[in-house]
Amino acid sequence: MKNTDKKIAVFSNYKPQSKEVCQLLIKKLRQNRFILTDKNPDIVISVGGDGMLLSVFHKYEKQLDKVRFVGVHTGHLGFYTDYRDFEIDKLIDNLKLDTGAQVSYPILNVRIFLEDGSVKTKLALNEATIKRSDRTMVADVMINHVAFERFRGDGISVSTPTGSTAYNKSLGGAVLHPTIEALQIAEVASLNNRVYRTLGSSIIVPKKDKIEIFPTRNDQHTISVDNRTYTFKHIAKVEFQIDNHKIHFVASPSHTSFWNRVKDAFIGEVDDEI
């Protein structure tokens, strides 16, 4: 595909540095004869941080089979970004050499079944979390049609492999490599005593298994899907499963390996004497 055939959409957050980088990037893309359009793009470039990339993911979540993403970070290293703000020229050069290769990560499908029979479907790149709005949540958890436990606590989070480094990690969950197509269940402040017991640790669930959560109260619950929050009453159950689609990133020599992202985000440089 020639530069003049590639349709590219560019988005940034509202921070001055991101807007400045975005304007420079758009200028250089035009100089190199790329087509700039938000409608049915081949490549979507996010300028900002992981939060911005989550936003553009949801903007194009119905076109995942046709779109590849690129992240440009204007702060600290992000998990979904391959370029820093001072690497715009490198990004342009790699886009000119782009062959259509991609790096793909699994995403989460969330189905919310309401008592009136309606079903709401959401997609998550990082995680989805269900909580009762103002009281302790009580819910039955079923894994692959096995009644697993009755949960009592603040909520339950289900994350993707790439999302395992986000909210899931702060809940004490494990970090999963994205080539492991599995979901992870993490408890949010569970109640554990002589009367009420849960497993008390995160659970890795394989791709083929379905996670079902049945709230025992029909009052108001909140369901957070990445950086979006929804409120529902009268939830019959919520299903979590790996979606049939994946998110695709532009593969390039600059694509940072997952373990390098983890190291840079949480550990930093390792002492050579170790």
From Swiss-Prot:
Its cofactor is a divalent metal cation. NAD(+) binds at D50, G51, N126, E127, R152, D154, T165, A166, Y167, N168, K169, S170, A189. It comes from the Bacteria. InterPro entries: ATP-NAD_kinase_N (IPR017438), ATP-NAD_kinase_PpnK-typ_C (IPR017437), NAD/diacylglycerol_kinase_sf (IPR016064), NADK (IPR002504). GO terms for molecular function: ATP binding; metal ion binding; NAD binding; NAD+ kinase activity. Its main location: cytoplasm. GO terms for cellular component: cytoplasm. Belongs to the NAD kinase family. Involved in the regulation of the intracellular balance of NAD and NADP, and is a key enzyme in the biosynthesis of NADP. Catalyzes specifically the phosphorylation on 2'-hydroxyl of the adenosine moiety of NAD to yield NADP. This is NAD kinase. It comes from Streptococcus gordonii (strain Challis / ATCC 35105 / BCRC 15272 / CH1 / DL1 / V288). The gene is nadK.
